[in-house]
Amino acid sequence: MPGVSVRDVPAQDFINAYAQFLQRQGKLEVPGYVDIVKTSAGNDLPPQEAETWFYKRAASIARHIYLRKQVGVGALNKLYGGAKNRGFRPHKHVDASGSINRKCVQALQKIGVLEISPKGGRRISENGQRDLDRIAAQTLEEDDE
């Protein structure tokens, strides 16, 4: 479908489709510690999906950067952070793990989806935009059927 972009597809459908694409492609460099690490200091446990959560995080980061001009790792830490349960005391926002987000961004940059922005942070590359639009069109076609 010509003219289909990531904005035209529901977020969850696109993220799942792009994560499956990244996993099938096998080029995304996954750190060895992803099956035991927590994603934030505010979390009690690591993610339930030990094999696929890193691909979903990378797909979500790619979509987030696609929808904006450029994004840095600090903004991603704030985005993926959440409330820390402090018992009887009020909840407070805790940023997500910077290491995980940095490794996702570096892996996406290595396969050519992202590039360094001269203004700071990362932005989507032309090849990355083409890939994401192609996956979005395929996802939209599957939803129509």
UniProtKB/Swiss-Prot annotation:
Organism: Candida albicans (strain SC5314 / ATCC MYA-2876) (Yeast)
Key words of the record: Cytoplasm, Ribonucleoprotein, Ribosomal protein
Quaternary context: Component of the small ribosomal subunit. Mature ribosomes consist of a small (40S) and a large (60S) subunit. The 40S subunit contains about 32 different proteins and 1 molecule of RNA (18S). The 60S subunit contains 45 different proteins and 3 molecules of RNA (25S, 5.8S and 5S).
Biased composition (Basic and acidic residues): 123-134
InterPro entries noted in UniProt: Ribosomal_eS19, WH-like_DNA-bd_sf, WH_DNA-bd_sf
Protein name: Small ribosomal subunit protein eS19
Keyword Oxidoreductase on entry: no
Family: Belongs to the eukaryotic ribosomal protein eS19 family.
Chain positions covered by the region annotation Disordered: 120-145
Coiled coil region boundaries: none
Gene Ontology MF, one: structural constituent of ribosome
Free-text function comment from the UniProt entry: Component of the ribosome, a large ribonucleoprotein complex responsible for the synthesis of proteins in the cell. The small ribosomal subunit (SSU) binds messenger RNAs (mRNAs) and translates the encoded message by selecting cognate aminoacyl-transfer RNA (tRNA) molecules. The large subunit (LSU) contains the ribosomal catalytic site termed the peptidyl transferase center (PTC), which catalyzes the formation of peptide bonds, thereby polymerizing the amino acids delivered by tRNAs into a polypeptide chain.
Lineage of the organism: Eukaryota, Fungi, Dikarya, Ascomycota, Saccharomycotina
GO biological process: ribosomal small subunit assembly; translation
GO cellular component: cytosolic small ribosomal subunit
Localization terms from the record: Cytoplasm
